[in-house]
């Protein structure tokens, strides 16, 4: 069984130093994870992210590593609004230079929950619009964070087409799944679907067409239920695959096969 973790923050300080990141990669490979996508969060850590990915590519070749650059909506609270345009211009320059391993734009999006309250909704929308324009200009997919803002995100995506993108750690309803999929986008599920009373993500997982289904850990956050209180890591993606398989009443091997193929197709990666 081969799995693709489409969202894991292996570069975060919670994974310690380079040695600990490499060990996490080896554990992931032993669990059947063949590829991991590590997204950016804030401009000040882009260089460290690219260095971490380069190190993993060189020293943990048991897993194929990819990355993305963007500005997370929660990171806006720490960014002076006067710097927004400069940060977005720097992002565009980085993306156009296409550093090794960069296959997407993000993590970016909208967070209208408490964690995103440090930036106004208007500011979040403006920053996301810039990411959407960059995706249109480059043809790269987006890694979209969306919390309590699905209707607004749908409106933005409907204004002008963007390349097929990923709804990361989907928290919306099953009823909204068709609207996102009509735009060509994929829906990714994380550890929340493993929780005992997680009815909403299970219903959503059933509603996603097979060719739009993805898996992720969102490590180090969202540890699957059976692994708590441990820090989450890509090796635990197996638990999420099993939970999605159970929700859809399908063999876990079939879920692994289709989600890995979907990720490679959307990110335009060779098998």
Question: Across the structure, where does each feature detected by a protein language model lie?
Answer:
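Mid-domain alpha/beta scaffold segments of enzyme catalytic cores
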Residues: 1-271
């Amino acid at each position: 069984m081969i799995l693709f973790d489409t969202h894991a923050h292996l570069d975060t300080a919670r994974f310690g130093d380079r040695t600990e990141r490499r060990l996490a990669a080896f554990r992931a490979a032993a669990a059947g994870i063949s590829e991991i996508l590590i997204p950016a969060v804030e401009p000040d850590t882009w260089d460290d992210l690219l260095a971490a990915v380069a190190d993993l590519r060189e020293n943990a070749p048991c897993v194929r590593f990819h990355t993305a650059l963007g500005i997370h909506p929660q990171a806006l609270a720490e960014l002076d609004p006067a710097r927004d345009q400069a940060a977005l211009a720097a992002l565009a320059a980085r993306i156009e230079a296409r550093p090794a391993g960069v296959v997407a734009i993000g993590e970016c999006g909208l967070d209208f929950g408490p964690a995103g309250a440090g930036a106004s909704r208007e500011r979040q929308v403006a920053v996301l619009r810039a990411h959407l324009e960059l995706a249109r200009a480059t043809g790269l997919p987006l890694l979209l964070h969306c919390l309590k803002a699905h209707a607004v995100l749908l409106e933005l995506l409907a204004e002008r087409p963007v390349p097929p993108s990923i709804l990361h750690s989907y928290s919306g309803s099953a009823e909204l799944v068709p609207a996102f999929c009509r735009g060509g986008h994929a829906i990714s599920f994380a550890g929340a679907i493993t929780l005992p009373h997680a009815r909403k993500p299970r219903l959503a997982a059933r509603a996603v067409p097979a060719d739009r289904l993805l898996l992720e850990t969102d490590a180090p956050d969202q540890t699957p239920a059976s692994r708590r209180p441990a820090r989450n890591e890509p090796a635990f993606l197996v638990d999420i695959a099993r939970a999605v398989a159970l929700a859809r009443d399908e063999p876990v091997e079939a879920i692994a096969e289709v989600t890995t193929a979907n990720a490679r197709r959307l990110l335009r990666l060779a098998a």
